[in-house]
C-alpha cells in the first residue's frame, strides 16, 4: 500500500504465510519470554501478533519500548502452531516474524512524577478496559478513544448518521445547512452568545435549533429539508443530555399532516434501530394523548416496556372512612393507584422502603398501600377503612390479582401523576418487569397549547409557540386557553424522549392571537420574530417537522446509560472541556476588541 503498510492489522490469514509484509500501529500488549518477545500490534482495524527474536539488533529496543508507542515493522508471515491459535482475533492463525523495526513515535511520560503516575494509569486502561473518573478520561480522551468499547461507540455513531442521511435522501429530502451564527431564538433554554467585533455591544447566538430557518425554507418553496444539525443550549448535564452541544436529525416538510410526518419517522427509525441493534424493535408506534400518558404512566415520556398501568381511584376514596385521602379529595386533590404484582407476601420493610424512597427522592408526602393475600383478602394500613365494595372496585380498576399489592399516591393532579409515574418506574425496575431486549416507541400527541405559570402568575406556551392549535383561530377566540390543544408531538423510546415536533402555525392572524394570549403585543412579535412574520406575509404553506436527537439514538443503540459515552469529545457534567481547557479566560486585548469588560 505504502512505506508504512502493505496490510491492515486485521487482514493477514493462513494463505498469506511466507509473504513479506509491512505493518504499522500501536504497541498494544507485550509479552517477554526471554529469547522471544511477543507483541500485539494494533491499528484501527484490528490486531496482529508480532514475534521478535533476540538475535536481532533491535531486540533491546523493542524490549524497552513503552506500550502505545507507534511502530512500523517488516517481517515474514508464519502459521501459528495449532496449540497457539487465537480464535478471538481475525488474524489468530498467523504471526509475523519481524526482520525490521522502525519506531515512529515513542511514549514519553511527563517529567512531573504525579502527572506521570496519572498518565501511566490511564495508559494501562487501554488494554485492561479499567474504568477511571470521568474527568481523567476526558482529559486524556485521545487515549480513552483507543479503548475498544469507546472506539466502537464512535464508529457506531458514524454508521448511524450515514444511514440516517441515506434514508432521508432516499425519501426525497434535501440536506441543507443553516447558519450557526444567528439571532437568539425562543426555544426556552439559555443561549450561548457570541459578541460581534464589528458591531460593539451586539451579540450573535448559537442556534438552539434551526427552527426559524427550516420554516423559512418551507416558505421559500422547498418541500423536504433535513440536516444533521448541531444545536447549542446552555443547559445542565443529565444522563440523557450533554451540556452545550448536541446533534439532531432536523427535518421539515410542507403540505403535510401530522400523520405524514409520523410515517417518515417511523419508517426511518425502525430501519435504523433494526439494522444497528440485536434487540427486537416493536413495529407499532402507538399514539397516546398527553392526558392519557399522564394518567396511565405518570409521565409524558412513558416506558412501554413496563406493563404497569396507573389508575385514577379518586372516586373510590371520596366520602370513604380513610380521612387522609377523603380530606385531600375535598380540597381538590386526586388519588392514583399503582399495582405491584406478586408482592403481597413481601415483608413490611419492602413497603416501608418504597414509602421512604418516594418521600426522599420523589417529593411525595407519603404513599399508602393495600395487599391482597393468596385468597384475595385485603390487608394493610388502608384496607380497614374501606368496605368490600370499595375494595372490589380497586381490584377491578387496577386489575390486581390475589398475591398482588397496590400503592396509592394522593396530591394535586400534576404532582400525583408525577409521583405515581416515578413509583411505577421504580416498581417496574425492582420487580424485573422491564424487558431489556426490546425497543418500544410511542407518540405523545395533543399537548396543551398553553399552561398557567404559577411563578409568573400568567399564561404561557406549554411547548413550541409556533405550533398550530386544534380548532385554529376559533378555539383561540372562544375556548378557555388552558383547554386548547396543540398539534405538537413527542417521540419516545423506552422512556427516553427522542424528539419533539409540531405542525406549524402558518397564519399570521392565528400567530398574533396565540402570542397575545401569552402576553405578547403585536409589536413584540414583529420585533422578536421579524423574519418569520415577513415571510408569512408572502404565502406560507402548511408545514410541520420534527428533530430526533442523534446522540440519544446512538446512546440507546449502543446500550449506554450515559449520553457522554457516545460523543467523541464530550464536556463533563459542569460544562467543561477538560481536554482543551474550555471555557477559559480571555486576555484584555481580545476583550477590548469585542468592547467587553469582565466584572468580577
From Swiss-Prot:
Binding site for L-aspartate: 187, 233, 463, 504
Binding residue positions for ATP: 233-235, 497, 549-552
UniProt xrefs under SUPFAM superfamilies: Class II aaRS and biotin synthetases, GAD domain-like, Nucleic acid-binding proteins
Gene Ontology cellular component annotations, sorted alphabetically: cytoplasm
Highest taxon of the lineage: Bacteria
Gene Ontology MF annotations: aspartate-tRNA ligase activity; aspartate-tRNA(Asn) ligase activity; ATP binding; nucleic acid binding
Site location (Important for tRNA non-discrimination): 33
UniProt-listed InterPro entries: Aa-tRNA-synt_II, aa-tRNA-synth_II, aa-tRNA-synth_II/BPL/LPL, Asp-tRNA-ligase_1, Asp-tRNA-ligase_1_N, Asp/Asn-tRNA-synth_IIb, AspRS_core, GAD-like_sf
UniProt-annotated stretches for the region Aspartate: 211-214
Record-linked Pfam families: GAD, tRNA-synt_2, tRNA_anti-codon
Enzyme class: ligase
Catalytic activity: tRNA(Asx) + L-aspartate + ATP = L-aspartyl-tRNA(Asx) + AMP + diphosphate
Compartments reported by the entry: Cytoplasm
GO BP terms in the entry: aspartyl-tRNA aminoacylation
Entry annotated with the keyword Amino-acid biosynthesis: no
General function of this protein: Aspartyl-tRNA synthetase with relaxed tRNA specificity since it is able to aspartylate not only its cognate tRNA(Asp) but also tRNA(Asn). Reaction proceeds in two steps: L-aspartate is first activated by ATP to form Asp-AMP and then transferred to the acceptor end of tRNA(Asp/Asn).
Subunit structure comment from the entry: Homodimer.
Entry similarity comment: Belongs to the class-II aminoacyl-tRNA synthetase family. Type 1 subfamily.
PANTHER family linked: ASPARTATE--TRNA LIGASE, MITOCHONDRIAL, ASPARTYL/LYSYL-TRNA SYNTHETASE
HAMAP family to which the protein is assigned, alphabetical: Asp_tRNA_synth_type1
Protein name as it appears in the record: Aspartate--tRNA(Asp/Asn) ligase
Organism: Wolbachia pipientis subsp. Culex pipiens (strain wPip)
